[in-house]
Amino acid sequence: MQAKLIIGNKNYSSWSLRAWLLLREAGIEFEEHRICLDVEGCAEEIARFSPSGRVPVLLLDGQPIWDTLAIAETVAERWPEAKLWPQDPDARAHARSISAEMHAGFHALRDAMPMNCRAMGRKVALPDALTSDIDRVIAIWSDCHHRYGGSGYGDSGGWLFGEFSIADAMYAPVVLRFRTYGINLPDSACSYPERLLESSAMQHWLAAAESETEVIEREETGQ
């Protein structure tokens, strides 16, 4: 099966990161096609591949799958050997729940703290809605660490459910947001960001983001 992933700028496109990381960690070979966002002609180029006019979109033998969660579910279905959801039914239900929560929510966090891989030490105001989103993410990570971080579960790989899952792809951009804007984490929530950032796939993505020269001014938030 031929797989081609259409993504946006690696520095800014959080949904592109989710789909890309999922494929890389699953060990799936794919062609990458990057479209520079927010420039003349980008909408027309995206529309060549994506019925929704958004990235990412995954082409499997030419068939488009758009929306990151749809991509994730399709990949998990087509490549069951990748075990992209936890094998335990209760853990799998938990992983699906927090993935859907990230997919549908955290609007204050998205608006106030856009992903910007190159930026470090940025500061933004923390109104109540944003603080609530941050606290909820920390609670999710801490709960996963408590439930699944012990020896004997998922080989204790340091991911949210021991081994890499779709949930990790969904929360990866939040790790980068917290890094960019200097969000302090309690000890119970620190191990997951550390695990993600040290992975070879994330190191590859960050290096590519660093090498990009495009600047999207509306994404350059904070001082």
Pin down the residues of each PLM region.
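GST-like domain detector, emphasizing the conserved glutathione-binding G-site
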Residues: 1-127
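Short capping/connector residues at structural and topological boundaries
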Residues: 89-90, 165, 207, 211
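Short flexible/disordered coil segments
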Residues: 95-101, 147-153, 215-223
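Basic/polar N-terminal segments that are highly enriched at the extreme N-terminus
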Residues: 1-3, 139, 219-223
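Long hydrophobic alpha-helical segments typical of transmembrane helices together
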Residues: 188-223
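Short, contiguous strand/loop micro-motifs
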Residues: 5-7, 33, 162, 179-180, ...
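Active-site-flanking alpha-helical
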Residues: 76, 174-175, 206
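GST-like fold's C-terminal all-alpha helical module
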Residues: 102, 106-200
